[in-house]
Every structure is written in structure tokens, then in C-alpha cells.
Amino acid sequence: SPLKMALGKDVAGKAVAADLTAMPHLLIAGTTGSGKSVCINDILACFLLNMTPDELRLVLVDPKRVELTGYNGIPHLLSPVIVDAEHVVGALEWMMREMDSRYRKFSETHTRNIADYNRLCEKTSEKKLPYLVVVVDELADLMMLAPDETERTITRLAQLARATGIHLILATQRPSTDILTGLIKANFPARIAFAVASSVDSRVILDHPGAERLLGRGDMLFQAPDAPAPVRIQTAFVSDVEINRLATYWRGFTVTHLAPERPDQPAAFQTKKGVPLKQAPLWEEMEEEKDLDPKFDEAIDIVRSEGQASISMLQRKMRIGYTRAARIIDKMEEKGIVSEPDPKTQIRDILKTDESKAE
């Protein structure tokens, strides 16, 4: 199997391995210090020990800037390790375009999946397609920044990308329903649960309790997509020294065959012109002299329909941050649309109900 990975040992002391191509995507969750990042390093080490850059390409996302940056410079990477959450949606968009491109190639050659296509390439001496694996070390950061785009791209890739050799590994330390939505979970039948704080968190990950009784430090429950119940495993430990040795070994090689349209510039994975990387521009990042917030008219509609206005209400209704909601409310007060806040409740009355919105 091309994407075989060692998970650790079960309670009987037998080694446990899994195949990412059969999963075909993996969801990992657990509290801080439970062993998520160690497990990811374990999986990546297995890939790097068994596959060349011609066979496998990686996209690594590490918002914490600690766990995966040690892999920078290895020829398997399509771009340097992504540490800015703003670029991740663009990376997922690039993956979707690559998926569509591969499906077109399959259609032209009358093949069904990447294995059939690569076998055909062996006969015709054409260039094979590498497997593409996206590893996200913290999903919560993306879901807070751009929940709609993140969920949409992850779901589409999870549903369609399997046959094209594109696989996802997502990890989070916040196993809550707003991060691991029903749509995401439905497309990730293979899951790993490390130690969590409560049975509620365990149910979010595995759909039943048990992970709250794990010991931590690599103690995990692995739910295979074809297994009726999860298996308890102690994950393998790959030290930083071993990771550095592995990365240093691969840095000594040059890449002879690049993945199609390799995006290896600093502005990697940019979406099409005019398409923002984030769900909406952060108002606090805009210049003061620019026009009104793009959502100002929408905010006026909301406060008029509610009959009152408050910062917390705009946060809930519009799914925006406190700073942006506060600026919108201040601008409404400046234009005479809402009153000053009530000293006790901080709720504002609507002063203008029938005047035109901001032009």
C-alpha cells in the first residue's frame, strides 16, 4: 500500500498499522499534551521513509508554528509549511482545482482512479501523478477565521478527492460541534481520539464515550472506517532528533519531477484574482479612511428588524468579531441611526427607521 502508516501497539502488544488510501481521510482530536502532534509526526515519518517526492507531495498547515516547521525544505512539500491561517483556504481551493484537473485526465484516458492512471502511465512512459496529502495541525483556527469556506472546501475534497489520490488529515484540540461539524464528521469515518476532558467531547469525536478515560501521552482510541468499535492503541513516539535526521536526509536531494503547476512562490496557493482568502475582510485590518464596513447595510437591516441594537447581537447574527461589531455600532450612532447605550443593559434604541441606507 502506498500510504501505509504505523499507529502504535494495541493492548496485546501487537503492532497496528493502517492505510490512508483505504480510510480515505483521517480526523484526529484530543486535548493539549495528549499526543496529537506526536501522532502526526509518526504518520509523516512513515510517509517519508517509504515514498519519494515523485510518489507523494505534502501540504502542511501549522498555525502553532512549532510542530511541523521542522519539515521545511524537504522536496515532498508543495510549498513551505503554511503558518498563516489566511492562506489555508487558498491552499484548499488549489487542491480542488488540482482534483478537477486530475478527473479530466482520468476521463481522457478512461481510467477510474489514480492507481489505474499510474499503471497506464507505466505502459506509456508518461509522468505518474503523485499522491497529495494535506495535514492540518489545528482545524479550530481555520473554522474561527472562515467557517463557511473551510467547511465547504474540506467537505468537497473529502467527498470527491479520494479517487484522485488527494487525502486529508485534520487535527484539533477543540472537539466541539462548532469545529467538528456534522458535515465534516460525516466525511471522515476514520477517527483517532486522544485523551479529552469529558464524555461529551468523546461523543463529538467518536459518537460514543470512552476517550475521557484515556491516560494521555499517546494513549488513543482508533476508529477504523470498517470496524464496529474503536481499538485502544499506544501511539509510537518519534523524537525531534529522528525527525531532524529524516528531514536533513531528504533536503540533500533535488527534485527531478515536480507536481503539476507547483505553487512554490511565497504567495503560494493564491485563489483566482478577486477571490478573497478569508471569508470576509477583517474590519480592524482596513484603513481608517476607507468607506463603510461592507456589512454596514446588512447590520442596519438586522437592528431594524430586531427593534434594538447591541454589539453582542451583531456578533451573533453576523458571525463577526467584537471589534468589527463595535465599530459598526459606533458608526450607526454617529449617523444617528441608533441611540446611546443604556447604562445598565448596553442596548440601544433605533432612532431612524425609514431613511435610506449608506450609499
Each model region followed by its residue ranges:
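Conserved lysine of the Walker
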Residues: 36
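The Walker A (P-loop) glycine that initiates the GxxxxGKT/S ATP-binding motif of P-loop NTPases
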Residues: 29-30, 316
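P-loop NTPase motor-domain active sites and their immediate coupling elements
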Residues: 1-11, 15-17, 22-23, 54-57, ...
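The conserved Walker
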Residues: 31-33, 172
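P-loop NTPase switch/communication element
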Residues: 18-24, 48-86, 90-91, 183-184
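Hydrophobic positions on the alpha1 helix immediately C-terminal to the Walker A/P-loop
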Residues: 39, 43
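Short, well-ordered alpha-helices that flank and scaffold nucleotide-derived cofactor binding pockets
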Residues: 45, 49, 159
